[in-house]
Amino acid sequence: MAKSRPLQRSTALRSHAFPASQHPAPALGMSSDKALLPLGALMLAASMGAAAQGSAPETTMSTVTVKETAEIQGKDTLLLKKTTVGKGKQDIKDIPQSVTVFTEKLMADRNQDDFREVLRTTAGVTFLAGETGEEDVRLRGFSLGQAGDIYIDGMKDAPLIERDTFNHDRVEVLKGSASMLFGKGSTGGVVNQVNKAPLLIDQHEAAYTFGTGNSHRATGDFNFVTGENAAFRLNAMVQEADNYGAKQDKRGIAPTFAWGIGTRDEFSIGLYYLESKGRPTYNHPWRLSADGKINTTLPARNFYGLESDYTNTSSQYATLGHIHRFDDGGELNTRLRYGTYERDMLASTIGFQNSAITLGQINDSTVLTRYGSKGRMGESDVLQVQSDYSNTFNWGGKKHAVLTGVDYYDDDAKRNQNYANTT
């Protein structure tokens, strides 16, 4: 037993305790078997324990099912159940007012390329000719432009500009008092244009449309996935038309990049540019009939103006967005937008050379003349900051929704007085 202690130590520290010449000694060989017995017993016990564990029955966890409604694109459906016409995403059924949503698919099926064409099919919407040629959109009799009730992604849009649907995912119309959801505005309603956003799927689409009046229009919608939660989307449009002298040429492009899509913090940056050059139809010569009613005997399809008439508009803005999602389901949506909007118009006022001419005297030889012109120039530099917080919670056995936020809007407008001349 006196020898077993140093021999056990030499097994663990063999390379340090003995020279190499002493390893073949018989005493070392005889004692090594005894020294390894405890190690062999330990290995046998470990193998028996492993076998016992392997024979234990497996425990199967119960199946967990997770359900969530997929985000639906405007181009995939004619009907949407949610809207962002307010300061957050809501179910249409929860808004105690009439809401109409025009999805991208619906606008494409109807071939509605212009903002006015979309609204023209909405009950309660009418159009009046403005003093400087633009159309005044009215909802339930109230002017949307004058009240500032036209929005883009929930942020106020500039008035007196040309609009197009090439970058629209949908157009939402809320009828009724706008103050319920926006805290301002008229009692007519609100129109909200929702721009297309990057998606986590590669998809590309191009379209070409042609028609009478030398009308040609080409659009492109391209979406690229650039990372695990990042994507880039580009929309572009070119349109040309010359309908009996009333020309219109439009160019538009809208790139958007987003990262962190669907995560706790989502960021986006987008640019938008739309340029429109046209020749307006400012007025139509007319005469009063014997009973005092306005009578337009000249064909409406003709262009009553001069080749030098023009209406040029441009819209360009950049938008930065950030969405923070809290653990309790709350969401803080912050947007910063800066844009420049320009409008330059010169239109002729056309009438009969003989101001005393009667309806019975009008024929193919009747001479028309230009009585004067109407013009307007304007430029607006707009800065907007908007931050909205929304959340839902249960209290008192009922579900409640919280919606609050801040909104800053600064419009530095430079406009001349409406000018007119008779030369």
PLM region spans:
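Face-selective signature of the C-terminal outer-membrane beta-barrel domain
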Residues: 320-340, 371-423
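Repeated loop/turn-to-beta-strand initiation elements of outer-membrane beta-barrel proteins
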Residues: 229-232, 264-269, 329-332, 397
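Outer-membrane beta-barrel proteins
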Residues: 48, 197, 224-228, 259-263, ...
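Outer-membrane beta-barrel translocator/receptor signature
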Residues: 167-169, 180-255, 261-266, 316
